[in-house]
Amino acid sequence: MATFVDRVTVHLRAGNGGNGCVSVRREKFKPLAGPDGGNGGNGGDIVLVADPQVTTLLGYHRRPHRSSGNGGFGMGDHRSGHTGEDLELPVPVGTVVKSSEGAELADLTEPGMRIVAAPGGIGGLGNAALSNPKRKAPGFALLGTPGWEGDILLELKTVADIALVGYPSAGKSSLIAALSAAKPKIADYPFTTLHPNLGVVQVGDVRYTVADVPGLIEGASEGRGLGFEFLRHVERCSALLHVLDCATLEPGRDPLSDLDVILAELAAYPVPEGQLPLLERPQLIALNKIDVPDARELADFLRPDLEARGYRVFEISTVSHEGLRPLSFALAELVERARKEQAVLDETRPRIIVRPKTVDDSGFVVKVEGGSEGPVYRVLGAKPERWVAQTDFQNDEAIGYLAARLAKLGVEDQLVRVGAVAGSTVVIGRENGVVFDWEPTLTSAAELISSPRGTDARIGVNARPTRAQRREDYFDRMDAKAEARAELLREREAGLWKDDDAAVQGGSEETGRE
């Protein structure tokens, strides 16, 4: 069973915002106490936190679906709904957060760094919050918006100062075990190391981290062996240490050819934009296993050739610890130099300037798209899309409120500017946007999703009569019935017609008397 996972796709569902409440205060001797509907609670966020105690993404590989709490609905008596509980997900330091399309969202390189990966929905306002001098008792409330839902990609890139690279069984794991207190798996067969191992080395006042990555072979960039995808763990390293095996018995292999193969594979690895290519970083060479017979002679023979290439060479043995002390001090020197250079870069790095929105920023755009039945005008913007999501399209007053907000924002004026005419198809939102047929004589014309295309529930008159109207209608019907009965009585008395039932009944009585 896998114990180390460095790349995983996680499906997140943030909490939905609670709906606002429609309520009117009912109290004795106060018939006009006013609205008292509370607001809905906000949905919980899903937050990623860089935790130094976490070293793998295995937990998210086993449970890829995570969700936070929903916000509570508003209630009467000005009681707001509860806020949904946030969900904090600990991830290893060095985790890169990417969208499902591959765009980098955040790089959690320091312990304690946080990012809201999935924001929760916004709670809807109750009718108490929507009341004003002109709308004293709103008969509607705003709905809560849904929380963000989708997939993100978590990719772990080990944060280390020095990376050990080399062929399988070159002694990289033994070296990191000799330099630090790390205890990686060590065996005498290739590909013993299947995932990166980290070790902390203390040299004088300098402390640095060494990463042991799985071995590289020729063709790793084409997928041979374990491939070279794990080289993402080398991207953050400031220097490389090539560990060459001077005691290999495999035919066709020698330390120089091994080095050429490793350099070719490192050159084929694409580093992210803005980072220094792997081969342009400081590199040292460690000729390992000089304790083996004939290995020391081979190391002495190869050393001049490697130094002629510009490398600084160390002859070491992880068994006898020979040469490890000067190697550790040389690595510390590289780390100190890289840290000073990084400090200078951080000081000269351009600062991110957040500028406020311009005065004439409307907060939305109108795009004209082609359609089979003519142009489609799509309104995109945070405010219009959120307002549509918060509107209860089963409530006429809520639709009117949406129309007023869109008109005040300037949506109708912008539609006129881009060429929309009466009957044009307008969509607010993206894929699941609300479609309506635009009528410029109205403030807006939001179409009910459940109603036929081109109709608008706001245009219809509210057919529910008042109590006085029902009372007046009842008396009118009673008066009409009384007048009709009186008219029939007058016509019968005038002989214009006679009651057949009465005539039949009279004839039966005469027959009985005979």
UniProtKB/Swiss-Prot annotation:
Its main location: cytoplasm. GO terms for molecular function: GTP binding; GTPase activity; magnesium ion binding. Residues 2-159 form the Obg domain. GTP binds at residues 166-173, 191-195, 212-215, 288-291, 317-319. Gene3D superfamilies: GTP-binding protein OBG, C-terminal domain, GTP1/OBG domain, P-loop containing nucleotide triphosphate hydrolases. Mg(2+) binds at residues 173, 193. The keyword Oxidoreductase does not apply. Pfam families: DUF1967 (PF09269), GTP1_OBG (PF01018), MMR_HSR1 (PF01926). One of its GO terms (biological process) is ribosome biogenesis. Residues 76-85 have a biased composition (Basic and acidic residues). It comes from Leifsonia xyli subsp. xyli (strain CTCB07). An essential GTPase which binds GTP, GDP and possibly (p)ppGpp with moderate affinity, with high nucleotide exchange rates and a fairly low GTP hydrolysis rate. Plays a role in control of the cell cycle, stress response, ribosome biogenesis and in those bacteria that undergo differentiation, in morphogenesis control. Residues 356-440 form the OCT domain. This is GTPase Obg. Its cofactor is Mg(2+). Keywords: Cytoplasm, GTP-binding, Hydrolase, Magnesium, Metal-binding, Nucleotide-binding.
